[in-house]
């Protein structure tokens, strides 16, 4: 299994949603099933997060960074290193005639039963941070901020929280 690229960079501004793609290429002779896991499931949505790739075929995986609250400091982002783990398993002979949908839903059992055949590959995530600008003397820093929601949170951080909760509820984010 090849993963292109081997690392992802989400570009600033980090308080906005952004999307990157990885390509999973099955360079083997057997079909494989894969699952994508993340160390930060509330910050990312992955589609598809589990799928089957035929021999010598590839799949593009969409990774959506949901954005961070404006209060997150740049140095805090530098210290956090989000990661993705791509878990792959060649489809066992006993499952060759099983329909794809059933195979995908049986992933937890496959993972437990064939744990010695599983291959793990990590993808590191990096966030590019814009250089800090010095405020000019004529502009009021308060006027440059997003409108307040009334409780100290900006509307954008509230919207990100709502999107994350909805994503969790409809099953966009898997562990």
Swiss-Prot record:
BP-aspect Gene Ontology terms: endoplasmic reticulum membrane organization; endoplasmic reticulum-plasma membrane tethering; phospholipid biosynthetic process; regulation of phosphatidylinositol dephosphorylation; reticulophagy
One GO cellular component term: plasma membrane
Tagged with keyword Glycosyltransferase: no
Residue ranges of the TM segments: 155-175
UniProt keyword list: Membrane, Transmembrane, Transmembrane helix
Family as reported in the entry's similarity comment: Belongs to the VAMP-associated protein (VAP) (TC 9.B.17) family.
Described function: Targets proteins containing a FFAT motif to membranes. Involved in regulation of phospholipid metabolism.
The protein's name in its UniProt record: Vesicle-associated membrane protein-associated protein SCS22
Source organism (scientific name): Saccharomyces cerevisiae (strain ATCC 204508 / S288c)
Gene that this polypeptide is encoded by: SCS22
């Amino acid at each position: 299994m090849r993963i292109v690229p081997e690392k992802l960079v989400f570009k600033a501004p980090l308080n906005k949603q952004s999307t990157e793609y990885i390509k999973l290429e099955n360079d083997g002779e057997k079909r494989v099933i894969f699952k994508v896991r993340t160390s930060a499931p509330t910050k990312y949505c992955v589609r598809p997060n589990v799928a089957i790739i035929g021999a010598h075929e590839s799949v593009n995986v969409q990774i959506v960074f949901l954005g961070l609250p404006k209060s997150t400091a740049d140095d805090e982002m530098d210290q956090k290193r989000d990661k993705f783990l791509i878990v792959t398993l060649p489809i066992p002979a006993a499952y060759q005639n099983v329909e794809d949908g059933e195979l995908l839903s049986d992933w937890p059992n496959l993972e437990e039963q064939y744990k010695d055949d599983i291959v793990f590959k990590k993808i590191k995530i990096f966030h590019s941070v814009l250089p800090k600008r010095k405020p000019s003397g004529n502009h009021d820093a308060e006027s440059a901020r997003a409108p307040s929601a009334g409780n100290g949170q900006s509307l954008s951080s509230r919207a990100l929280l709502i999107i994350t909760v909805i994503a969790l509820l409809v099953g966009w984010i898997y562990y």
